[in-house]
C-alpha cells in the first residue's frame, strides 16, 4: 500500500494493500478502494451531498457504500460522491465529478471535467469525452461514445415547478452502441436507439430510432448508419 502522508482516510474506509493514494486525497467512511486502484492528488471519494436549503431536491447526507473497482484510475481533482459504484479498469479524468447514486461500469472513460449527476447509470466500455454534462436520472448503456461539450437535461419545466418530483426529472436513455457528436444537446426523456448516431451540434427534441443518423436544429433523420 502506498498512501501519501497528506492523504486523509477516515475510519470505516477500506483501502486495498496495493492501492496508491497520492497527496491530499480525502477518502470518507463507507468507501471501498479495491486492488490496483490509483487515486491522484486532491481527489475526494465518498463525500456526501449538501444542499444548503437552496434546492428543491432533498438529499441524503449520510455516508453510504462507495466503491472504486479494481485497477481503476481516479485522476487529479476528481470528486466521487457517496453511494456510487465505479467499475473495474475505469478512468476518471482530471476534475471529473460523479454525484451520489451513480453506477459506472467496467472499462469506461469519464474524461476531464465531465460531470455525471445523481442516480445515473452508465454501462461497460462507454466513453464520455471532455467537458460533457450527463444529467441526473439518465441511463447510458454499453459501448456508447459521447463526444466533447455534449449537454443533456432532465427537466422540461426548467425549475419552475413548486417542488421536486423525481418521476418528472428524467434524463435521456442512450442505448447500446450509440454515438453522440461534439456539442450536441439532448433534451429530457429522449431515447436514442441502438447504434444510432447524433451529429455534432444537433439539438435532439425527439426520440432517435436505432441505426439512424440525425443532424440539425432540431435534429432530423438524414440516413441509416453505415
Regions found by a protein language model. Give the residues of each.
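Structural signal for interior beta-strand "rungs" in well-ordered beta-sheet cores
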Residues: 2-52, 56-215, 220-221
Amino acid at each position: 500500500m502506498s498512501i501519501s502522508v497528506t492523504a486523509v482516510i477516515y475510519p470505516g474506509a477500506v483501502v486495498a494493500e496495493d492501492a496508491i493514494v497520492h497527496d491530499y486525497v480525502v477518502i470518507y467512511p463507507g468507501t471501498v478502494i479495491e486492488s490496483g486502484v490509483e487515486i491522484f492528488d486532491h481527489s475526494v471519494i465518498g463525500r456526501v451531498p449538501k444542499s444548503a436549503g437552496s434546492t428543491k431536491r432533498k438529499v441524503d447526507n449520510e455516508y453510504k457504500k462507495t466503491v472504486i473497482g479494481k485497477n481503476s484510475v481516479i485522476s487529479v481533482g476528481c470528486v466521487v460522491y457517496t453511494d456510487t459504484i465505479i467499475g473495474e479498469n475505469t478512468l476518471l479524468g482530471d476534475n471529473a465529478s460523479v454525484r451520489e447514486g451513480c453506477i459506472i461500469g467496467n472499462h469506461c472513460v469519464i474524461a476531464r471535467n465531465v460531470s455525471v449527476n445523481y442516480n445515473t447509470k452508465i454501462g461497460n466500455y462507454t466513453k464520455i469525452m471532455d467537458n460533457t454534462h450527463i444529467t441526473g436520472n439518465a441511463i447510458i448503456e454499453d459501448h456508447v461514445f459521447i463526444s466533447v461539450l455534449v449537454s443533456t437535461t432532465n427537466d422540461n419545466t426548467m425549475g419552475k415547478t413548486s417542488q421536486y418530483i423525481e418521476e418528472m426529472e428524467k434524463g435521456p436513455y442512450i442505448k447500446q452502441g450509440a454515438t453522440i457528436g461534439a456539442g450536441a444537446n439532448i433534451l429530457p426523456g429522449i431515447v436514442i436507439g441502438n447504434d444510432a448516431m447524433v451529429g455534432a451540434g444537433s439539438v435532439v427534441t425527439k426520440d432517435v430510432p436505432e441505426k439512424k443518423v440525425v443532424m440539425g436544429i432540431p435534429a432530423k433523420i438524414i440516413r441509416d448508419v453505415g
